[in-house]
Amino acid sequence: MNSFSFNRFRKALRWVWSMNFRSLMMWTTGFSLVIFFAEMMIWYLNTGMTTENIVGIILLFITIFFMIGVGASISSMFLEVNKKPRREAFLMLPASNLEKYLSVVLYFTVAWTVCIFLSIAVGDTLRMVFRSLVSGDEWVSCIPRFIDSFMPSFLYRSIYDYTLSYKVMQAVVLTAMMFWIHSFYTLGATLLRKYTFVLTSLTFIFIIALFGDVVNNSRIELFTAVWEGDRYVSQGVGTLAYVLAVVLPLLAAINYWASFHIFKGFQLITNKWTNYDILKR
């Protein structure tokens, strides 16, 4: 199986879907209820505030919830495979290592991200329906603003009138960063067998804190905006932005390569903590 086959990949993806679909639906239902009750509590605790401010607080909550949910889902992509019966069946699938690897990564990246978003939309809708029926409130959804927060800045006009090159570089750096973060959590999911999300997140936070400290001490600019009092003057793209636009994709490629290399070495019996036993290499 040296060549990639979309037919084998489709069958492997279908197997991954069938093995995880029930838990996906259960988690989606649970997430929807969490969002509903959390939004109701936020609304109740901030009754004296304006609707705009309450929606802003809810938007912050669901954004953090979404990011944590996606990170946790990626970290758990090989959780079921770590169970011996599932691991044996998965390793015996009539597909190449690349096809099996991509089927798992694609499912837990796309399917779980979509379902987490749907759970947020359902929970937000339940809150609007409940408050409309009980309190007579108007229907104010947080979803449009939530979607706008992930849109590239060059797709809409800014009140600061940034140049197109500035907006494009922002989008490039953000995209590169997202791919690097995804590859980092994918590597953690492939390498670790226990406390994957916690250990990967702690390592990620340490790297970001170290990077921030280095940048702060070296005074390297990422993006700059010059103001004179309350008047916006100009903007610029710093050297660090160009460096990150090149380095982050390279680091992401290394992470994906390392993750796939570990995946190819999956054994039916391995140690308790990792999927990579360096003593056997």
Roles of regions detected by a PLM:
Residues 1-87, 97-281:
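Hydrophobic alpha-helical transmembrane segments of membrane proteins
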